[in-house]
Swiss-Prot record:
Cellular localization per UniProt: Cytoplasm
Cofactor note: Binds 1 Mg(2+) ion per subunit. May bind a second metal ion at a regulatory site, or after substrate binding.
Listed GO biological process terms: DNA replication, removal of RNA primer
Required co-factors: Mg(2+)
Record-listed Mg(2+) 1 binding positions: D8, E46, D68
Keyword set includes Signal: no
Gene behind this protein: rnhA
Name the UniProt record assigns to this protein: Ribonuclease H
Domain RNase H type-1: start-end pairs: 1-140
Metal-binding as UniProt keyword: yes
Subunit structure: Monomer.
InterPro entries: RNase_H (IPR050092), RNaseH-like_sf (IPR012337), RNaseH_domain (IPR002156), RNaseH_sf (IPR036397), RNaseHI (IPR022892)
Annotated organism of origin: Legionella pneumophila subsp. pneumophila (strain Philadelphia 1 / ATCC 33152 / DSM 7513)
PANTHER family per UniProt: RIBONUCLEASE H1 (PTHR10642:SF26)
Reaction equation(s) it catalyzes: Endonucleolytic cleavage to 5'-phosphomonoester
């Protein structure tokens, strides 16, 4: 099955209250997801959005995943292979930040054939604007 996933994370303060939003599109249908955490960072919320989107898939899929986070897109397309090879350490020999989320995302990604796409945030991209609103709703619902 072919699926489009749009993801976004948001944070009020960094760290601070954060939220994530997801839009899944498949077979002419759409499903939205969102949530939040009281104390987090924007990067953690970007990762959580991708994790939650992939967790929603019931079987292996052909996925086009769209994000406005270069951290997420480059992490999955470029950096993760080196991190794994180096025992989850970066080029400075420091432990990779958010390693537990990267590991979870890597495990989920291994189930699917994923094409990672970067889109410019806050630029009138309809789906990106929607998941941004969902991420902010995740923050609002914390209070």
């Amino acid at each position: 099955m072919k699926v489009e996933i749009y993801t976004d994370g948001a944070c009020k303060g960094n760290p601070g209250p954060g939220g994530w939003g997801v839009l899944l599109r498949y077979n002419g249908r759409e499903k939205t997801l969102h949530g939040g955490e009281a104390q987090t960072t924007n990067n953690r919320m970007e990762l959580m959005a991708a994790i939650k989107g992939l967790e929603a898939l019931k079987r292996p899929c052909e996925v086009d995943l769209y994000t406005d986070s270069q951290y997420l897109q480059q992490g999955m397309k470029e950096w993760i292979k080196t991190w794994k090879r180096n025992g989850w350490r970066n080029s400075k020999k420091e432990l990779v930040k958010n390693a537990e989320l990267w590991k979870s995302l890597d495990n989920l990604a291994s189930i699917h054939n994923i094409h990672w796409h970067w889109v410019k945030g806050h630029s009138g991209h309809l789906e990106n604007d929607l998941v941004d609103a969902l991420a902010n709703l995740g923050i609002e619902e914390l209070s």
